[in-house]
Protein backbone atom coordinates (compact mmCIF):
# COMPACT_ATOMS: atom_id res chain seq x y z
CA UNK A 1 0.00 0.00 0.00
CA UNK A 2 1.39 3.39 -1.01
CA UNK A 3 -0.04 5.00 2.14
CA UNK A 4 2.20 2.73 4.17
CA UNK A 5 5.31 3.37 2.04
CA UNK A 6 7.65 6.20 2.99
CA UNK A 7 9.76 7.77 0.24
CA UNK A 8 12.71 10.05 0.94
CA UNK A 9 13.13 12.52 -1.94
CA UNK A 10 16.33 14.41 -2.68
CA UNK A 11 15.35 18.10 -2.70
CA UNK A 12 17.76 20.45 -4.45
CA UNK A 13 15.71 23.65 -4.39
CA UNK A 14 14.97 23.38 -8.11
CA UNK A 15 11.79 22.59 -9.99
CA UNK A 16 12.50 18.96 -10.91
CA UNK A 17 13.00 17.57 -7.41
CA UNK A 18 10.07 19.57 -6.05
CA UNK A 19 7.73 18.20 -8.72
CA UNK A 20 9.01 14.67 -8.11
CA UNK A 21 8.12 15.05 -4.43
CA UNK A 22 4.67 16.50 -5.17
CA UNK A 23 3.91 13.71 -7.65
CA UNK A 24 4.67 11.12 -4.99
CA UNK A 25 2.44 12.91 -2.47
CA UNK A 26 -0.28 12.99 -5.15
CA UNK A 27 0.11 9.24 -5.65
CA UNK A 28 -0.46 8.57 -1.96
CA UNK A 29 3.04 7.97 -0.63
CA UNK A 30 4.23 9.33 2.68
CA UNK A 31 6.97 11.72 1.53
CA UNK A 32 9.96 13.23 3.33
CA UNK A 33 12.47 15.60 1.73
CA UNK A 34 16.26 15.61 2.10
CA UNK A 35 18.39 18.58 1.12
CA UNK A 36 22.05 17.52 0.92
CA UNK A 37 24.52 20.32 1.59
CA UNK A 38 27.84 19.98 -0.23
CA UNK A 39 29.35 23.46 -0.14
CA UNK A 40 28.87 24.34 3.54
CA UNK A 41 31.65 24.34 6.08
CA UNK A 42 32.76 20.70 6.56
CA UNK A 43 32.98 21.42 10.28
CA UNK A 44 29.25 22.17 10.63
CA UNK A 45 26.90 19.57 12.10
CA UNK A 46 26.89 16.43 9.87
CA UNK A 47 23.76 15.03 11.53
CA UNK A 48 20.27 15.26 10.08
CA UNK A 49 18.73 18.65 10.84
CA UNK A 50 15.15 19.90 10.27
CA UNK A 51 14.95 22.36 7.37
CA UNK A 52 12.59 25.26 6.65
CA UNK A 53 12.75 24.52 2.91
CA UNK A 54 9.27 24.58 1.34
CA UNK A 55 8.60 22.74 -1.93
CA UNK A 56 5.03 24.00 -2.45
CA UNK A 57 2.79 26.88 -1.42
CA UNK A 58 -0.17 24.49 -1.20
CA UNK A 59 -0.75 22.97 2.22
CA UNK A 60 -1.45 19.46 0.91
CA UNK A 61 2.06 19.32 -0.58
CA UNK A 62 3.92 20.56 2.48
CA UNK A 63 6.31 17.82 3.55
CA UNK A 64 8.92 17.61 6.31
CA UNK A 65 12.38 18.37 4.93
CA UNK A 66 15.74 17.62 6.52
CA UNK A 67 19.25 18.74 5.65
CA UNK A 68 22.35 16.57 5.68
CA UNK A 69 25.78 18.17 5.48
CA UNK A 70 28.06 16.02 3.32
CA UNK A 71 30.51 18.82 2.51
CA UNK A 72 33.53 16.96 3.88
CA UNK A 73 32.73 13.86 1.84
CA UNK A 74 31.99 16.00 -1.23
CA UNK A 75 35.33 17.76 -0.92
CA UNK A 76 37.18 14.44 -0.70
CA UNK A 77 35.22 12.29 -3.15
CA UNK A 78 34.11 14.79 -5.79
CA UNK A 79 36.30 17.91 -5.65
CA UNK A 80 39.41 15.84 -4.91
CA UNK A 81 38.61 13.53 -7.81
CA UNK A 82 37.99 16.52 -10.11
CA UNK A 83 41.37 18.05 -9.34
CA UNK A 84 43.35 14.82 -9.55
CA UNK A 85 41.82 13.86 -12.89
CA UNK A 86 42.95 17.11 -14.50
CA UNK A 87 46.41 16.68 -12.97
CA UNK A 88 46.50 13.22 -14.59
CA UNK A 89 45.60 14.69 -18.02
CA UNK A 90 42.07 13.28 -17.90
CA UNK A 91 38.80 15.22 -18.22
CA UNK A 92 36.54 14.39 -15.26
CA UNK A 93 32.78 14.20 -14.98
CA UNK A 94 32.06 15.17 -11.37
CA UNK A 95 28.26 14.87 -11.67
CA UNK A 96 28.52 11.11 -12.25
CA UNK A 97 30.69 10.62 -9.16
CA UNK A 98 28.45 12.93 -7.12
CA UNK A 99 25.34 10.94 -8.01
CA UNK A 100 26.90 7.72 -6.78
CA UNK A 101 28.96 8.82 -3.78
CA UNK A 102 26.99 11.81 -2.50
CA UNK A 103 23.36 11.87 -3.65
CA UNK A 104 22.43 8.19 -3.55
CA UNK A 105 24.80 7.37 -0.70
CA UNK A 106 23.39 10.25 1.34
CA UNK A 107 19.78 9.44 0.50
CA UNK A 108 20.12 5.78 1.46
CA UNK A 109 21.94 6.59 4.69
CA UNK A 110 19.29 9.15 5.64
CA UNK A 111 16.52 6.73 4.62
CA UNK A 112 17.81 4.28 7.22
CA UNK A 113 17.81 7.01 9.87
CA UNK A 114 14.29 8.17 8.96
CA UNK A 115 12.86 4.66 8.41
CA UNK A 116 12.05 5.42 4.78
CA UNK A 117 11.36 2.49 2.47
CA UNK A 118 12.45 4.06 -0.82
CA UNK A 119 14.36 7.05 -2.18
CA UNK A 120 13.57 9.27 -5.16
CA UNK A 121 15.15 12.06 -7.19
CA UNK A 122 14.15 14.43 -9.98
CA UNK A 123 16.39 12.85 -12.61
CA UNK A 124 15.04 12.36 -16.13
CA UNK A 125 15.39 8.58 -16.33
CA UNK A 126 13.27 5.61 -15.34
CA UNK A 127 13.54 2.14 -13.83
CA UNK A 128 11.66 -1.14 -14.14
CA UNK A 129 12.04 -4.53 -12.47
CA UNK A 130 12.38 -7.20 -15.16
CA UNK A 131 14.03 -10.60 -15.27
CA UNK A 132 15.09 -10.46 -11.65
CA UNK A 133 16.96 -7.15 -12.06
CA UNK A 134 16.15 -3.49 -11.66
CA UNK A 135 16.79 -1.95 -15.07
CA UNK A 136 17.63 1.64 -15.92
CA UNK A 137 16.21 3.46 -18.96
CA UNK A 138 16.58 6.79 -20.70
CA UNK A 139 14.07 9.48 -19.88
CA UNK A 140 11.21 10.02 -22.33
CA UNK A 141 12.44 13.58 -22.93
CA UNK A 142 15.60 12.83 -24.94
CA UNK A 143 16.75 16.46 -24.65
CA UNK A 144 16.73 16.15 -20.85
CA UNK A 145 17.62 12.47 -20.47
CA UNK A 146 20.07 12.02 -17.57
CA UNK A 147 20.63 8.27 -17.70
CA UNK A 148 24.23 8.92 -18.83
CA UNK A 149 24.98 10.35 -15.38
CA UNK A 150 23.59 7.31 -13.54
CA UNK A 151 25.72 4.50 -14.97
CA UNK A 152 27.60 3.97 -11.69
CA UNK A 153 24.44 3.02 -9.78
CA UNK A 154 24.18 -0.64 -8.79
CA UNK A 155 21.29 -2.94 -7.94
CA UNK A 156 21.45 -2.08 -4.24
CA UNK A 157 20.69 1.56 -5.10
CA UNK A 158 18.31 1.07 -8.02
CA UNK A 159 16.08 -1.44 -6.20
CA UNK A 160 15.26 1.27 -3.66
CA UNK A 161 14.87 4.10 -6.19
CA UNK A 162 11.84 5.79 -7.76
CA UNK A 163 12.34 8.23 -10.65
CA UNK A 164 8.96 9.97 -11.09
CA UNK A 165 9.99 12.25 -13.98
CA UNK A 166 11.10 9.48 -16.32
CA UNK A 167 8.00 9.62 -18.53
CA UNK A 168 7.71 13.42 -18.63
CA UNK A 169 9.08 16.21 -20.81
CA UNK A 170 10.45 19.38 -19.24
CA UNK A 171 7.48 21.57 -20.31
CA UNK A 172 5.14 19.07 -18.63
CA UNK A 173 7.21 19.25 -15.45
CA UNK A 174 6.99 23.05 -15.40
CA UNK A 175 3.22 22.85 -15.95
CA UNK A 176 2.90 20.41 -13.06
CA UNK A 177 5.03 22.73 -10.94
CA UNK A 178 2.57 25.55 -11.50
CA UNK A 179 -0.39 23.35 -10.64
CA UNK A 180 1.37 22.08 -7.50
CA UNK A 181 2.22 25.62 -6.37
CA UNK A 182 5.98 25.04 -6.54
CA UNK A 183 7.83 28.34 -5.89
CA UNK A 184 10.68 27.21 -8.17
CA UNK A 185 8.33 26.63 -11.14
CA UNK A 186 9.97 29.34 -13.28
CA UNK A 187 13.50 28.95 -11.89
CA UNK A 188 16.15 28.80 -14.61
CA UNK A 189 18.41 25.77 -14.80
CA UNK A 190 22.13 26.00 -14.20
CA UNK A 191 24.45 24.12 -16.55
CA UNK A 192 27.54 24.89 -14.49
CA UNK A 193 29.51 22.60 -12.21
CA UNK A 194 28.24 23.68 -8.80
CA UNK A 195 31.67 24.31 -7.25
CA UNK A 196 33.31 25.97 -10.30
CA UNK A 197 32.37 29.69 -10.44
CA UNK A 198 31.44 30.86 -13.92
CA UNK A 199 32.20 27.35 -15.21
CA UNK A 200 35.84 28.50 -15.59
CA UNK A 201 37.65 25.35 -14.52
CA UNK A 202 41.10 26.74 -15.39
CA UNK A 203 40.76 29.64 -12.97
CA UNK A 204 39.24 27.28 -10.42
CA UNK A 205 42.23 24.93 -10.58
CA UNK A 206 44.63 27.86 -10.18
CA UNK A 207 42.80 29.05 -7.09
CA UNK A 208 41.98 25.66 -5.55
CA UNK A 209 45.40 23.99 -5.85
CA UNK A 210 47.96 26.18 -4.02
CA UNK A 211 51.01 24.37 -5.41
CA UNK A 212 49.68 24.00 -8.97
CA UNK A 213 52.46 26.17 -10.42
CA UNK A 214 55.05 23.85 -8.85
CA UNK A 215 53.32 20.64 -9.95
CA UNK A 216 52.50 21.74 -13.50
CA UNK A 217 54.67 23.82 -15.81
CA UNK A 218 54.36 25.08 -19.37
CA UNK A 219 55.59 22.90 -22.21
CA UNK A 220 55.64 22.30 -25.93
CA UNK A 221 52.68 22.47 -28.29
CA UNK A 222 53.40 20.20 -31.27
CA UNK A 223 51.69 19.37 -34.56
CA UNK A 224 50.96 15.92 -36.00
CA UNK A 225 54.56 15.58 -37.25
CA UNK A 226 56.03 16.45 -33.85
CA UNK A 227 57.14 19.93 -34.90
CA UNK A 228 56.98 22.52 -32.12
CA UNK A 229 54.43 25.18 -33.08
CA UNK A 230 54.04 26.93 -29.74
CA UNK A 231 53.95 26.51 -26.00
CA UNK A 232 51.18 25.62 -23.56
CA UNK A 233 50.78 26.95 -20.03
CA UNK A 234 50.21 23.58 -18.35
CA UNK A 235 48.47 20.44 -19.60
CA UNK A 236 45.60 20.47 -17.02
CA UNK A 237 44.26 23.59 -18.76
CA UNK A 238 43.54 21.70 -21.99
CA UNK A 239 41.12 19.01 -23.09
CA UNK A 240 40.70 16.83 -26.17
CA UNK A 241 39.01 18.68 -29.04
CA UNK A 242 39.86 22.13 -27.69
CA UNK A 243 40.42 24.75 -30.37
CA UNK A 244 40.36 28.09 -28.58
CA UNK A 245 43.21 29.48 -26.54
CA UNK A 246 45.99 27.35 -28.01
CA UNK A 247 48.22 30.34 -28.76
CA UNK A 248 49.55 28.96 -32.04
CA UNK A 249 48.93 30.16 -35.58
CA UNK A 250 49.25 27.60 -38.39
CA UNK A 251 47.04 29.11 -41.06
CA UNK A 252 44.28 26.56 -40.46
CA UNK A 253 42.16 25.46 -37.49
CA UNK A 254 43.98 23.15 -35.08
CA UNK A 255 42.65 21.10 -32.19
CA UNK A 256 44.08 19.33 -29.17
CA UNK A 257 44.33 15.69 -30.24
CA UNK A 258 46.19 14.19 -27.27
CA UNK A 259 47.83 15.20 -23.99
CA UNK A 260 51.14 13.70 -22.87
CA UNK A 261 51.69 14.44 -19.16
CA UNK A 262 54.88 12.36 -19.01
CA UNK A 263 56.69 14.58 -21.53
CA UNK A 264 54.55 17.65 -20.71
CA UNK A 265 53.49 17.97 -24.32
CA UNK A 266 50.20 18.90 -26.02
CA UNK A 267 49.64 17.32 -29.45
CA UNK A 268 47.50 19.12 -32.02
CA UNK A 269 46.08 18.31 -35.43
CA UNK A 270 43.25 18.81 -37.88
CA UNK A 271 39.63 18.10 -37.02
CA UNK A 272 39.90 14.77 -38.82
CA UNK A 273 42.75 13.82 -36.49
CA UNK A 274 40.23 13.75 -33.64
CA UNK A 275 38.42 10.75 -35.13
CA UNK A 276 38.75 7.37 -33.39
CA UNK A 277 36.98 4.07 -33.86
CA UNK A 278 37.78 2.34 -30.60
CA UNK A 279 38.12 2.99 -26.89
CA UNK A 280 38.91 1.00 -23.79
CA UNK A 281 36.93 1.62 -20.61
CA UNK A 282 37.76 0.49 -17.08
CA UNK A 283 35.73 0.09 -13.91
CA UNK A 284 32.80 -1.34 -15.85
CA UNK A 285 29.49 -1.42 -13.99
CA UNK A 286 26.84 -3.66 -15.57
CA UNK A 287 23.25 -2.72 -14.71
CA UNK A 288 20.80 -4.38 -17.09
CA UNK A 289 22.81 -7.55 -17.64
CA UNK A 290 25.19 -9.85 -15.83
CA UNK A 291 28.86 -9.09 -16.63
CA UNK A 292 29.13 -10.34 -20.23
CA UNK A 293 31.68 -12.93 -21.32
CA UNK A 294 31.31 -12.60 -25.09
CA UNK A 295 31.29 -9.63 -27.51
CA UNK A 296 27.88 -8.16 -28.35
CA UNK A 297 26.30 -5.40 -30.42
CA UNK A 298 24.95 -2.29 -28.70
CA UNK A 299 25.07 1.50 -28.85
CA UNK A 300 27.23 3.78 -26.72
CA UNK A 301 27.55 7.42 -25.72
CA UNK A 302 30.92 9.02 -24.97
CA UNK A 303 29.60 12.30 -23.54
CA UNK A 304 26.33 13.65 -22.17
CA UNK A 305 25.01 15.31 -25.34
CA UNK A 306 26.26 12.50 -27.56
CA UNK A 307 23.78 10.41 -29.54
CA UNK A 308 23.97 6.65 -28.90
CA UNK A 309 26.19 5.24 -31.67
CA UNK A 310 26.19 1.61 -32.93
CA UNK A 311 29.18 -0.34 -31.67
CA UNK A 312 30.55 -3.74 -30.70
CA UNK A 313 31.40 -4.27 -27.04
CA UNK A 314 34.14 -6.76 -26.17
CA UNK A 315 34.56 -7.67 -22.47
CA UNK A 316 38.14 -7.80 -21.19
CA UNK A 317 39.81 -8.97 -18.00
CA UNK A 318 40.08 -6.74 -14.92
CA UNK A 319 36.57 -5.32 -15.35
CA UNK A 320 37.40 -3.54 -18.60
CA UNK A 321 35.82 -3.49 -22.04
CA UNK A 322 36.67 -2.41 -25.57
CA UNK A 323 34.04 -0.46 -27.50
CA UNK A 324 34.51 -0.49 -31.28
CA UNK A 325 32.29 1.97 -33.14
CA UNK A 326 30.95 1.16 -36.59
CA UNK A 327 31.71 4.74 -37.66
CA UNK A 328 34.43 7.04 -36.26
CA UNK A 329 33.71 9.21 -33.22
CA UNK A 330 35.25 12.63 -32.67
CA UNK A 331 37.20 13.69 -29.59
CA UNK A 332 36.89 10.58 -27.45
CA UNK A 333 38.29 11.83 -24.15
CA UNK A 334 40.07 9.97 -21.37
CA UNK A 335 38.29 10.41 -18.05
CA UNK A 336 34.84 10.76 -19.55
CA UNK A 337 32.27 7.96 -19.36
CA UNK A 338 31.35 5.47 -22.05
CA UNK A 339 27.76 4.37 -21.40
CA UNK A 340 26.35 1.35 -23.22
CA UNK A 341 22.70 1.06 -24.30
CA UNK A 342 20.33 -1.46 -25.85
CA UNK A 343 17.58 0.68 -27.33
CA UNK A 344 16.56 2.90 -24.37
CA UNK A 345 18.02 0.64 -21.69
CA UNK A 346 21.32 1.37 -19.95
CA UNK A 347 23.30 -1.87 -19.93
CA UNK A 348 26.32 -0.42 -18.15
CA UNK A 349 29.23 1.94 -18.39
CA UNK A 350 32.85 2.64 -17.56
CA UNK A 351 35.54 5.32 -17.56
CA UNK A 352 37.45 5.88 -20.81
CA UNK A 353 41.15 5.12 -20.33
CA UNK A 354 42.43 4.66 -23.90
CA UNK A 355 41.50 5.38 -27.51
CA UNK A 356 42.59 3.85 -30.83
CA UNK A 357 42.25 5.50 -34.23
From Swiss-Prot:
<comment type="function">
    <text>Catalyzes the 2-thiolation of uridine at the wobble position (U34) of tRNA, leading to the formation of s(2)U34.</text>
</comment>
<feature type="site" description="Interaction with tRNA">
    <location>
        <position position="123"/>
    </location>
</feature>
<keyword id="KW-0963">Cytoplasm</keyword>
<feature type="region of interest" description="Interaction with tRNA">
    <location>
        <begin position="144"/>
        <end position="146"/>
    </location>
</feature>
<feature type="binding site">
    <location>
        <position position="122"/>
    </location>
    <ligand>
        <name>ATP</name>
    </ligand>
</feature>
<dbReference type="GO" id="GO:0103016">
    <property type="term" value="F:tRNA-uridine 2-sulfurtransferase activity"/>
</dbReference>
<feature type="active site" description="Nucleophile">
    <location>
        <position position="98"/>
    </location>
</feature>
<dbReference type="Pfam" id="PF20259">
    <property type="entry name" value="tRNA_Me_trans_M"/>
</dbReference>
<keyword id="KW-0547">Nucleotide-binding</keyword>
<comment type="similarity">
    <text>Belongs to the MnmA/TRMU family.</text>
</comment>
<keyword id="KW-0808">Transferase</keyword>
<dbReference type="InterPro" id="IPR046885">
    <property type="entry name" value="MnmA-like_C"/>
</dbReference>
<dbReference type="Pfam" id="PF03054">
    <property type="entry name" value="tRNA_Me_trans"/>
</dbReference>
<keyword id="KW-0820">tRNA-binding</keyword>
<feature type="region of interest" description="Interaction with tRNA">
    <location>
        <begin position="303"/>
        <end position="304"/>
    </location>
</feature>
<protein>
    <recommendedName>
        <fullName>tRNA-specific 2-thiouridylase MnmA</fullName>
        <ecNumber>2.8.1.13</ecNumber>
    </recommendedName>
</protein>
<keyword id="KW-1015">Disulfide bond</keyword>
<feature type="binding site">
    <location>
        <begin position="10"/>
        <end position="17"/>
    </location>
    <ligand>
        <name>ATP</name>
    </ligand>
</feature>
<feature type="active site" description="Cysteine persulfide intermediate">
    <location>
        <position position="194"/>
    </location>
</feature>
<dbReference type="GO" id="GO:0005737">
    <property type="term" value="C:cytoplasm"/>
</dbReference>
<feature type="disulfide bond" description="Alternate">
    <location>
        <begin position="98"/>
        <end position="194"/>
    </location>
</feature>
<keyword id="KW-0067">ATP-binding</keyword>
<keyword id="KW-0694">RNA-binding</keyword>
<dbReference type="GO" id="GO:0005524">
    <property type="term" value="F:ATP binding"/>
</dbReference>
<feature type="site" description="Interaction with tRNA">
    <location>
        <position position="336"/>
    </location>
</feature>
<dbReference type="InterPro" id="IPR046884">
    <property type="entry name" value="MnmA-like_central"/>
</dbReference>
<keyword id="KW-0819">tRNA processing</keyword>
<dbReference type="Pfam" id="PF20258">
    <property type="entry name" value="tRNA_Me_trans_C"/>
</dbReference>
<dbReference type="InterPro" id="IPR014729">
    <property type="entry name" value="Rossmann-like_a/b/a_fold"/>
</dbReference>
<dbReference type="GO" id="GO:0000049">
    <property type="term" value="F:tRNA binding"/>
</dbReference>
<feature type="binding site">
    <location>
        <position position="36"/>
    </location>
    <ligand>
        <name>ATP</name>
    </ligand>
</feature>
<dbReference type="InterPro" id="IPR004506">
    <property type="entry name" value="MnmA-like"/>
</dbReference>
<dbReference type="GO" id="GO:0002143">
    <property type="term" value="P:tRNA wobble position uridine thiolation"/>
</dbReference>
<dbReference type="InterPro" id="IPR023382">
    <property type="entry name" value="MnmA-like_central_sf"/>
</dbReference>
Amino acid sequence: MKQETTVLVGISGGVDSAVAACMLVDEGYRVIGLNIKVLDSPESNPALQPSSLVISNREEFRIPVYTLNLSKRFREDVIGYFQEEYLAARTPNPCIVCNKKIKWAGLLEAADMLNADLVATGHYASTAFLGGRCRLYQGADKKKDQSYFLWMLQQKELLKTILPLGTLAKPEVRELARSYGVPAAEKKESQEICFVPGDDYCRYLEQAIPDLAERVRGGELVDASGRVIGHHRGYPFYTIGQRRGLGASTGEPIYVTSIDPVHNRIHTGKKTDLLSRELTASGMNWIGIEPPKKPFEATARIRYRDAPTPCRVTPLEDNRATISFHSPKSAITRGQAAVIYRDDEVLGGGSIVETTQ
